[in-house]
Amino acid sequence: MSAVPDLTAPRAVAAQASAPAVVASSEGYRGILKATALIGGASALNIVVGLVRTKVLAVLLGPAGLGLLGLYGSIVDLVRSVSQLGINSSGVRQIAAAAGTGDARRIAITAGVLRRVSLLLGLLGAGLLVAASSPLSTLTFGSAERASSVALLGAAVFFRIVSDSQGALIQGLRRIGDFARVGFFGALLGSLASIALVVVWGEQAVVPSLVAMAAGAALVSWWYARRVPMATVSLRWAEVRRESGALLGLGLAFMASGLIMMASAYGVRLIVLRHDGLDAAGYYQAAWTLGGLYVGFVLQAMGADFYPRLVALIHDDARSNQVVNEQAQVSLLLAGPGMAATLTLASLVLSVFYSSAFGEAAETLRWVCLGMTLRVVTWPMGFIIVARGDQRLFFITELAWGLVSVGLAWMLVSRYGHRGAGMAFFGAYVFHALMLYPIVRSLSGFRWSIATARSVLVFGVSVAAVFMAFQWWPTAWALATGALVTLASTVYSLRELLRLASPQHLPASVRRLLGALRMHSQGPP
């Protein structure tokens, strides 16, 4: 099945959504890898666009202007996060659930309610920012002189919320190609508009440039969203109330989860700061950022298709458990070698991305990498709770993780300094895995497949071996061990990914190259 479904009529939406979910295992793996490649490629291009935009704006605006841009951008992000009440995430779930029924009318109703709720929340968010512009200006800049500029940011909040909801519609229907294009072309159009404004008006265009970037994203998302055919329906009040209640109920749980994550991260940093000072806080920040950089990229790329796909199958326990196992296995195969490499080259990575002064954070980074490896394992399981729409259980598990994370940091930082914060991060994910597995087992009868368990064992042993080598052996021996483990895990991952994706579907030139490297194998039995 194409990652970009060709939906030419409302009936086609329903037909695609209700198509039998049981497919050959190799097709499932190929779908995962294709969607990951699409979203990952678009994300990489977005990063390039963002870097170019930042570079150009830095040259045009200078440090002060760029700092002003960052402050205004933070205001937009804060108000947007609060105002949209999590519907950007719950919208994906509701659209995917409607699509999973194969009912074209229900899809149209859910999409219509999502659009109306997002417009209402966008207007409320913009109004909130206008009303609070004076105190926000005083809080941020020390005076109310920039209140009018802060008020103008309300337009950016409105466009962002509308854009997010249209993206949720596209993602929920699993139009992954369109979803990737929305991200890239929205960023490109917004960046070109913002740069043009700054070229003409300089620092005075900082706020208009943020509005232009948001408007560009909204315009592109609207263009692709309007291509999705929908049945014509007239919404009844009872339907609006039911759909909006479900949308906002789960959305609030997502928002609460985000606040818990931010609060726990803030709490850990505050503990490190109070106990060891600013330098230690900087070491932990560097380790935490780099530890999650590659894993975050992989999981974000994979989640764009995995989440709506799982929602559509969530009432079929056997199929949904198969999908979670497939996703977990591919996640480990993609992220595992990266974790082994980061563990091995921790000091070098810190020096390259920051400076040689951050070398002391290497051990903290290794502890964070252990936690991130566990995160890769638990991440697909957690989606079972989210896909079921159980906001209470979702909130409880997130709250438990946050409390354990801060509690462990409070106990360990006093003894081990910033390294203790890394240990706490790892310990929190050990707790998360032990908590999550029995929960999802009771919900859907989930258990690891033999193939997934083998991948967990292989990469668990690999990462643990590299970590222990740096704890027990001289640096030279540890580096040699890490290099060998990274090489071996990379070869293993490539062979497994090629086997799962069925090499016969690759271009002939690629098959010949793989054959020369003796990595060519047949698809799964």
Language model: regions and residue ranges:
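Alpha-helical transmembrane segments of multi-pass membrane transport and lipid-handling proteins
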Residues: 2-18, 112-141, 191-192, 199, ...
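Membrane-proximal transmembrane or re-entrant/amphipathic helices at the cytosolic face
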Residues: 2-23, 468-525
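Interhelical loop/hinge segments that connect adjacent transmembrane helices in multipass membrane
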Residues: 4-32, 221-265, 308-319, 444-456, ...
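Membrane-water interface segments that mark the loop-to-transmembrane alpha-helix transition
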Residues: 30-46, 72, 77, 81-134, ...
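Transmembrane helical elements of multi-pass membrane transporters/channels
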Residues: 34-51, 66, 186, 210-217, ...
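Helix-loop junctions and terminal segments of transmembrane helices
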Residues: 85-101, 171-172, 287, 291-332, ...
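Hydrophobic alpha-helical transmembrane segments
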Residues: 147, 151, 180-229, 286-288, ...
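Membrane-interface junctions at transmembrane-helix termini in multi-pass inner-membrane proteins
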Residues: 158-183, 369-400, 442, 449
